[in-house]
């Protein structure tokens, strides 16, 4: 008899962002799998085994979790944010697609979480108030020229852009290159939001403009939102600014994009 595999989104940090469904799945699991820092956010429970691994070992982690489920173990695989956004849900599906036929019969559920772009947007107003897209700047699984083409297309089409994985120690140059690319298509005054570790003690939100956006404001714990030509900043005397993208696009702007 096989077990059950829950692919669980932990949200961006604080336990307040963990959904009730996710909390139940974590409590019911006999075995927990995930990137070490994410597992550290899950309270230890008696009788549960914990299997931390590196953030570049998603395929092996997914295969091991599926194997344990096939043996009758109740398993939870955790992801920060939402498991379906640059996270473990796709890795699990990839392994099911290429693995043993028996894995296709397993009870697998995907439990959503609050992804970083929504948590950051909520902190600052409504920068994703109109059409938007999400792009990962990591070139571990896709070539950098493809990332550049997607940035070009998104900026030219008038999307607000959420940038995941803006840089790391192994690739410190990529965020600067992405900003350089976006400057070809967007005004220098385009609002840019840096949201780091939302919901955690070291949370930091900063608002700047594309002209001055720099590497120093980002790391792997940062989510960057680049606004559109229509995105606006509301300065407030005793409160942090609000950033929003209007729901309506002026006809002249829409025709220029088309």
List each language-model region with its residue ranges.
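Short, surface-exposed amphipathic charged segments that create phosphate/polyanion-binding patches used
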Residues: 65-71, 122-126, 147-151, 205-212
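A polyampholytic, Gly/Pro-enriched intrinsically disordered region
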Residues: 73-78, 126-137, 155-159, 211-220
């Amino acid at each position: 008899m096989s077990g059950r595999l829950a692919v669980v989104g932990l949200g961006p940090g604080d336990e307040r962002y963990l959904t009730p469904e996710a909390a139940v799945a974590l409590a019911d699991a006999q075995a927990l799998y995930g990137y070490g820092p994410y597992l550290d956010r899950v309270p230890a429970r008696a009788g549960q085994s914990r299997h931390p691994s590196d953030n570049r070992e998603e395929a092996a982690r997914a295969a091991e979790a599926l194997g344990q489920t096939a043996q009758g173990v109740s398993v939870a695989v955790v992801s920060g944010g939402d498991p379906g956004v640059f996270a473990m849900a796709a890795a699990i599906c990839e392994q099911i697609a290429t693995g043993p036929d028996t894995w296709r019969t397993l009870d697998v559920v995907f439990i959503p979480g609050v992804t970083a772009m929504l948590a950051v947007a909520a902190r600052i107003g409504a920068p994703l108030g109109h059409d938007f897209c999400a792009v990962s700047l990591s070139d571990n699984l896709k070539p950098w020229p493809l990332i550049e083409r997607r940035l070009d297309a998104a900026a030219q089409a008038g999307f607000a852009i959420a940038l995941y994985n803006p840089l790391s120690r192994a690739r410190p140059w990529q965020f600067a290159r992405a900003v350089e690319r976006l400057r070809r298509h967007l005004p220098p005054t385009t609002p840019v939001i840096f949201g780091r570790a939302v919901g955690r003690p070291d949370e930091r939100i900063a608002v700047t403009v594309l002209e001055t956006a720099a590497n120093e404001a980002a790391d792997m714990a940062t989510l960057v939102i680049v606004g559109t030509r229509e995105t606006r900043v509301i300065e407030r005397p005793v409160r942090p600014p609000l950033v929003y993208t209007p729901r309506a696009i002026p006809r002249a702007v829409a025709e220029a994009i088309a």
